[in-house]
């Protein structure tokens, strides 16, 4: 099932307990797409790969189950969590509602320092996306997707953390963890998906800069809703194909189309919504 290269080095987690280290290393392997939805997790193999006993692996699985990343079945059989199409639609309906609300509340009170941070994260994402569009090397692309995922999480987390409601923020974090296993796989196979998502981040950032909470919330809801067909396509076929996703309501992004999307976003933030 696994190889030692699949997990991050123990050295990175040297100040943690063994169980915490196992949790973090497994979580990274899952959210970065090295372990994919539905994949069986064999405790003894993981313990051997990480050079630990089975006990901390077993305890780590319980933590990951609470985060929604792992499903444990009778007789201690564990799998990377996966969702049905109906579950994806239900989960994203709730995410769209809550994350739209959190975004609106954040933009209503956002500070210059917080906007500056979002701009910095976006600019870093811009650099990664540029590389992904230029380079065909699988290793470089894989590393780029990992970097983009980290920045993507930072961008979204920063938008929700300042919403003024810790329970709303915590609930969003839990819901986002439920689909974290799908983020790398739906982006790894389609640069069109990466480009469209990045363009939507541009619109969201522009609305934040102009202090347009309702516009920002609307753009965030659109951003989330348009992720659903890609995840469902992965569930149906194993990985999303741009043409197939397009047939279910998505469209590829060419340079011209991306420019038009950005224009639309800029027009949106110039409306009279406050």
For the regions a language model picked out, list residue spans one by one.
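Short linear motifs at protein or domain termini
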Residues: 1-108, 233-242, 248-274
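Short amphipathic alpha-helical segments at helix-loop
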Residues: 6-11, 38, 83, 136-140, ...
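C-terminal all-alpha effector/ligand-binding and dimerization domain
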Residues: 14, 180-274
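Amphipathic alpha-helical repeat elements characteristic of tetratricopeptide repeat
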Residues: 20, 96, 119, 195-199
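Alpha-helix N-cap/N′ positions at the starts of helices
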Residues: 75, 98, 151, 196-199
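Conserved amphipathic alpha-helical segments that form helical-bundle/coiled-coil interaction surfaces
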Residues: 86, 112-184, 198-210, 214-229
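Short helix-capping/hinge motifs at transmembrane helix termini and TM-loop junctions
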Residues: 107-108, 164, 188
């Amino acid at each position: 099932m696994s190889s030692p290269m699949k997990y991050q080095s123990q050295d990175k987690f040297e100040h943690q307990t063994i169980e915490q280290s196992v949790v973090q290393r497994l979580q990274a392997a899952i959210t970065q797409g090295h372990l994919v939805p539905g994949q069986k997790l064999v405790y003894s193999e993981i313990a051997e790969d990480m050079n630990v006993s089975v006990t901390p692996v077993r305890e780590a699985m319980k933590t990951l189950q609470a985060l929604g990343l792992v499903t444990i079945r009778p007789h201690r059989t564990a799998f990377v969590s996966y969702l049905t199409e109906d579950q994806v639609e239900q989960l994203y309906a709730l995410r769209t509602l809550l994350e739209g609300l959190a975004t609106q509340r954040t933009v209503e009170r956002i500070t210059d320092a917080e906007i500056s941070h979002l701009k910095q994260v976006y600019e870093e994402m811009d650099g990664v996306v540029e590389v992904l569009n230029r380079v065909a090397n699988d290793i470089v692309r894989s590393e780029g997707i990992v970097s983009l995922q980290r920045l993507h999480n930072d961008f979204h987390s920063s938008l929700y953390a300042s919403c003024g409601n810790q329970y709303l923020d915590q609930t969003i974090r839990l819901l986002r963890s439920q689909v974290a296993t799908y983020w790398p796989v739906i982006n790894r196979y389609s640069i069109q998906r990466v480009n469209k998502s990045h363009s939507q981040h541009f619109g969201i950032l522009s609305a934040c800069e102009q202090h347009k909470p309702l516009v920002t919330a609307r753009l965030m809801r659109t951003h989330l809703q348009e992720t659903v067909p890609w995840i469902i396509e992965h569930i149906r076929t194993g990985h999303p194909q741009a043409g197939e996703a397009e047939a279910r309501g998505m469209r590829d992004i060419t340079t011209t189309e991306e420019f038009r999307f950005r224009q639309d976003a800029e027009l949106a933030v110039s409306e009279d919504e406050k």
